[in-house]
Amino acid sequence: MAVTMYYEDDVEVSALAGKQIAVIGYGSQGHAHAQNLRDSGHNVIIGVRHGKSFDKAKEDGFETFEVGEAVAKADVIMVLAPDELQQSIYEEDIKPNLKAGSALGFAHGFNIHFGYIKVPEDVDVFMVAPKAPGHLVRRTYTEGFGTPALFVSHQNASGHAREIAMDWAKGIGCARVGIIETTFKEETEEDLFGEQAVLCGGLTALVEAGFETLTEAGYAGELAYFEVLHEMKLIVDLMYEGGFTKMRQSISNTAEFGDYVTGPRIITDAVKKNMKLVLADIQSGKFAQDFVDDFKAGRPKLTAYREAAKNLEIEKIGAELRKAMPFTQSGDDDAFKIYQ
């Protein structure tokens, strides 16, 4: 299905002009949205609970308030707290202070789509979801371009929710390179599937299985690390720049031949069948409920998963090897640590 890409010239109405904007949260996405909007000439305040993020927002020159106070002052509110915290923040701080006729935005559809947050009918609901982490949203903006984004007009009480979403995307720099209109359902389900089946869950499981196959056959762990993890970036960068075509043009004929004949032996019809089961769990809300239940119970499952992952042999070997490869550290992780 073809989609339309919109750009700055397509944003005909300055829907944010003269509006008081409140960004809720000052983490990875929060600092980027707030700073980019301010640099685009908009009036931005920060709503965040007292702590490091509160202090950092003030240090960066923003008027900073507790969440409820910021919401009460604002015409347009963007919720950029972590998914698992949004429901309680909404119920305790946002909902009691939300004015009729205001607009409430999100950068991911999790809580709206799965029904954990229900917004009054007299409030606009929109989404702008940059397809990049916050430090890249900020950095690319300062460099004069931006990152692509998805946008949604979900609840159009004022008749201007779509214009607000598009103007927000323009204000943070995303409309410079292109924005695509979608729905909360599509963004949420596709995003979760991509993370789980390919980008995070699928990829780490594939790398770990490859590492174990080599080491169990007697090959050195250090060499296995280079073959299945370290060189991953080289291949992904080529695909990022020019798709499968550029990657295959850049590798040896031996590697390309092996790609064609062996890839389907690894990613079989059975794997695709499992992917469909993963998608079904996402669509039904099962994954969302499992995630929320674990959070409310104090994260026992997530904590156990993290501990097990930390003790993987590939992680221990990789940590030692990277000490001798400072070039693997881009510096972007420092920005992430600051704005968590």
From Swiss-Prot:
<keyword id="KW-0028">Amino-acid biosynthesis</keyword>
<feature type="binding site">
    <location>
        <begin position="26"/>
        <end position="29"/>
    </location>
    <ligand>
        <name>NADP(+)</name>
    </ligand>
</feature>
<dbReference type="GO" id="GO:0009099">
    <property type="term" value="P:L-valine biosynthetic process"/>
</dbReference>
<comment type="pathway">
    <text>Amino-acid biosynthesis; L-valine biosynthesis; L-valine from pyruvate: step 2/4.</text>
</comment>
<feature type="binding site">
    <location>
        <position position="227"/>
    </location>
    <ligand>
        <name>Mg(2+) 2</name>
    </ligand>
</feature>
<keyword id="KW-0560">Oxidoreductase</keyword>
<feature type="binding site">
    <location>
        <position position="195"/>
    </location>
    <ligand>
        <name>Mg(2+) 1</name>
    </ligand>
</feature>
<comment type="pathway">
    <text>Amino-acid biosynthesis; L-isoleucine biosynthesis; L-isoleucine from 2-oxobutanoate: step 2/4.</text>
</comment>
<comment type="function">
    <text>Involved in the biosynthesis of branched-chain amino acids (BCAA). Catalyzes an alkyl-migration followed by a ketol-acid reduction of (S)-2-acetolactate (S2AL) to yield (R)-2,3-dihydroxy-isovalerate. In the isomerase reaction, S2AL is rearranged via a Mg-dependent methyl migration to produce 3-hydroxy-3-methyl-2-ketobutyrate (HMKB). In the reductase reaction, this 2-ketoacid undergoes a metal-dependent reduction by NADPH to yield (R)-2,3-dihydroxy-isovalerate.</text>
</comment>
<dbReference type="Pfam" id="PF07991">
    <property type="entry name" value="KARI_N"/>
</dbReference>
<keyword id="KW-0460">Magnesium</keyword>
<feature type="binding site">
    <location>
        <position position="231"/>
    </location>
    <ligand>
        <name>Mg(2+) 2</name>
    </ligand>
</feature>
<dbReference type="Pfam" id="PF01450">
    <property type="entry name" value="KARI_C"/>
</dbReference>
<dbReference type="InterPro" id="IPR008927">
    <property type="entry name" value="6-PGluconate_DH-like_C_sf"/>
</dbReference>
<keyword id="KW-0521">NADP</keyword>
<dbReference type="GO" id="GO:0050661">
    <property type="term" value="F:NADP binding"/>
</dbReference>
<dbReference type="GO" id="GO:0005829">
    <property type="term" value="C:cytosol"/>
</dbReference>
<dbReference type="InterPro" id="IPR036291">
    <property type="entry name" value="NAD(P)-bd_dom_sf"/>
</dbReference>
<dbReference type="InterPro" id="IPR000506">
    <property type="entry name" value="KARI_C"/>
</dbReference>
<feature type="binding site">
    <location>
        <begin position="83"/>
        <end position="86"/>
    </location>
    <ligand>
        <name>NADP(+)</name>
    </ligand>
</feature>
<protein>
    <recommendedName>
        <fullName>Ketol-acid reductoisomerase (NADP(+))</fullName>
        <ecNumber>1.1.1.86</ecNumber>
    </recommendedName>
</protein>
<comment type="similarity">
    <text>Belongs to the ketol-acid reductoisomerase family.</text>
</comment>
<dbReference type="GO" id="GO:0004455">
    <property type="term" value="F:ketol-acid reductoisomerase activity"/>
</dbReference>
<feature type="binding site">
    <location>
        <position position="53"/>
    </location>
    <ligand>
        <name>NADP(+)</name>
    </ligand>
</feature>
<dbReference type="GO" id="GO:0009097">
    <property type="term" value="P:isoleucine biosynthetic process"/>
</dbReference>
<feature type="binding site">
    <location>
        <position position="191"/>
    </location>
    <ligand>
        <name>Mg(2+) 1</name>
    </ligand>
</feature>
<dbReference type="InterPro" id="IPR013023">
    <property type="entry name" value="KARI"/>
</dbReference>
<feature type="domain" description="KARI C-terminal knotted">
    <location>
        <begin position="183"/>
        <end position="328"/>
    </location>
</feature>
<feature type="binding site">
    <location>
        <position position="252"/>
    </location>
    <ligand>
        <name>substrate</name>
    </ligand>
</feature>
<keyword id="KW-0479">Metal-binding</keyword>
<feature type="binding site">
    <location>
        <position position="134"/>
    </location>
    <ligand>
        <name>NADP(+)</name>
    </ligand>
</feature>
<dbReference type="InterPro" id="IPR014359">
    <property type="entry name" value="KARI_prok"/>
</dbReference>
<dbReference type="InterPro" id="IPR013116">
    <property type="entry name" value="KARI_N"/>
</dbReference>
<feature type="binding site">
    <location>
        <position position="49"/>
    </location>
    <ligand>
        <name>NADP(+)</name>
    </ligand>
</feature>
<feature type="binding site">
    <location>
        <position position="191"/>
    </location>
    <ligand>
        <name>Mg(2+) 2</name>
    </ligand>
</feature>
<dbReference type="GO" id="GO:0000287">
    <property type="term" value="F:magnesium ion binding"/>
</dbReference>
<keyword id="KW-0100">Branched-chain amino acid biosynthesis</keyword>
<feature type="domain" description="KARI N-terminal Rossmann">
    <location>
        <begin position="3"/>
        <end position="182"/>
    </location>
</feature>
<feature type="active site">
    <location>
        <position position="108"/>
    </location>
</feature>
